[in-house]
Each structure stands twice: as structure tokens, then as C-alpha cells.
Amino acid sequence: MSRINFAGHDIDKYKTPDFYQEKNKKYVNFGSDNLYPLYLVDLFNRSAKHNAILTGKQTYVYGSGLKIEGVWDLFANANRFDSLDEIFNKCILDKLLYGGYALQIIWDRVGESIAEIYHMDFSKIRSNVDNTEFYFNNEWADPKSKIKSYKVFNPEKKQGAQIYYYRDYRPAVTT
């Protein structure tokens, strides 16, 4: 008779990040030190298996990419650097890695239509408690670095730069 041994994992070692707003800050911290996204990137970059799993899933989700026809031809080039297809692929990886993604939507000067769409590195975005304002920082680890704020994407208020923000639903977790 053969025996089967199961390797166990100490689940208590793996903790989900805390999301909380400090009294003197407008944004919600992403982890106890507000650097949890960098931890996720580090895992992604240092583990060949983890990297292969996520990039493999990204490839499957992306498939043949976006097929843009008709009126969407206007968005084939979402901005001067990226096509909408390239932005879509970046958002897929952010969704898999962080559980969310963010887009910067820039309205034309007249306020009639979207002029440009940019992918925003999700690791550099924080939100306020009710997800109506977003904060971008290239270096969250540096307390002196500049934080830029944006309003939530609102097709009724067609002005300036706004953020379209998607985050996976997690029961009992705010923002």
C-alpha cells in the first residue's frame, strides 16, 4: 500500500495588505508601509515561475488583441506613444499582478471628446476612501516626492485629465 504525503503551507505567514487612511493623508495606504505594490513587482521579477504564470495568463487573456473597426478607428492610437491595443495589454498585466488597473483619460480643450488615453502604472496610484480622487507618485518610498492628484473619470464633466480606476472586488475591503 502506498502512502500519500501532503505538504502543508502555513497560511498565517501570508497576510493580505492593510488598506487604511492616515489622519494627515488624503489617500489610502496600499499596505502597512504603502509599498505593497512594489513587493508584488519584486515577487514578479524575482520568481521565474510566478513571472511565467502571470505573463502566460496575460497572453491567454490578450489573445489576438483588440480588433478596432469603425468609429473606434479614432482610438487605434490612444496617444502619441501607444495604441489602444498596447494599453489593453498593459492593463491585463496590471489586473493580474495588482488586482486592478488605471487609465488617464484626457479630454480635448473644448470638452467634447476624449483626446488621449494613457496607461498609468497601477503601483504608482493611490485613491481616497471613496475612490473619487486619485494620487500619482513616481516614488512612494520617498516622502519628499511630488504627488499629483486627479479626479475620477466622469463623462459628464469633460475637462482636463481624469482617472478611470478599476479594482477587483474584495469582500470587506474598502478601496
Task: Tell me what each language-model feature is.
Residues M1-T175:
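Structured, contiguous alpha/beta core segments that scaffold functional sites
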